[in-house]
């Protein structure tokens, strides 16, 4: 997974500006601006909201489920470009609420496209944000839990 991430970041850095926030010391990739880790709860939402593209590369050992990072990006109002995740499609619409890619080349093509099409990118980010507010608030999740409990009783 880390090799996949590094490969994607390297390919992306050849076609657009890339900044990586990381805890890893000694991370040096040509063409990638490496910044030290920022606080996930305080600073990361601001970074997500203000970045043109937020990349999610899910670890290969995570076989099912929606990555929390994907929800965090959309919840902050950021544009999400993620590897394919079938569970995400159960709640949201690909190309309307987020964008997915199938490999590094596809990721780069889509990153360039959405950097060049700012209005479309911002619309997708806004749709994703609205969808998170509709479906993933504490109120909504608690209601779902009570619905499950009621069915079991």
Please annotate each region the language model reported.
Residues 9-13, 45, 112, 129, ...:
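Non-transmembrane alpha-helical segments in soluble domains
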Residues 98-104, 114-118:
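Conserved acidic donor-binding segment of nucleotide-sugar-dependent glycosyltransferases
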Residues 113, 120-134, 144:
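A short, well-ordered alpha-helix in the C-terminal region of glycosyltransferases
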Residues 42-43, 106, 110:
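Short acidic active-site motifs
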Residues 138-153:
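C-terminal alpha-helical cap of glycosyltransferases
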Residues 94-95:
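Glycine-centered loop/turn motifs
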Residues 1-63, 67, 79-88:
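Nucleotide-sugar donor-binding catalytic core of glycosyltransferases
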Residues 72-75:
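Short alpha-helix at the nucleotide-sugar/activated-sugar donor binding site of glycosyltransferases
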């Amino acid at each position: 997974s880390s090799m996949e991430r590094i490969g994607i970041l390297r390919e992306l850095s050849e076609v657009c500006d890339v900044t990586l926030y990381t805890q890893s010391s000694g991370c040096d990739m040509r063409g990638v601006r490496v910044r030290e880790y920022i606080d996930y709860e305080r600073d990361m939402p601001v970074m997500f909201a203000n970045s043109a593209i937020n990349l999610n590369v899910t670890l290969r050992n995570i076989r099912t489920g929606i990555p929390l990072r994907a929800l965090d990006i959309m919840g902050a109002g950021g544009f999400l470009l993620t590897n394919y995740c079938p569970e995400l499609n159960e709640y949201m619409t690909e190309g309307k609420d987020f964008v997915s890619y199938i490999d590094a080349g596809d990721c780069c093509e889509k990153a360039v496209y959405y950097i060049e099409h700012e209005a479309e990118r911002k619309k997708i980010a806004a749709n994703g944000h609205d969808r998170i507010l509709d479906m993933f608030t504490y109120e909504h999740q608690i209601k779902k839990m009570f619905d499950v409990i009621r069915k079991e009783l």
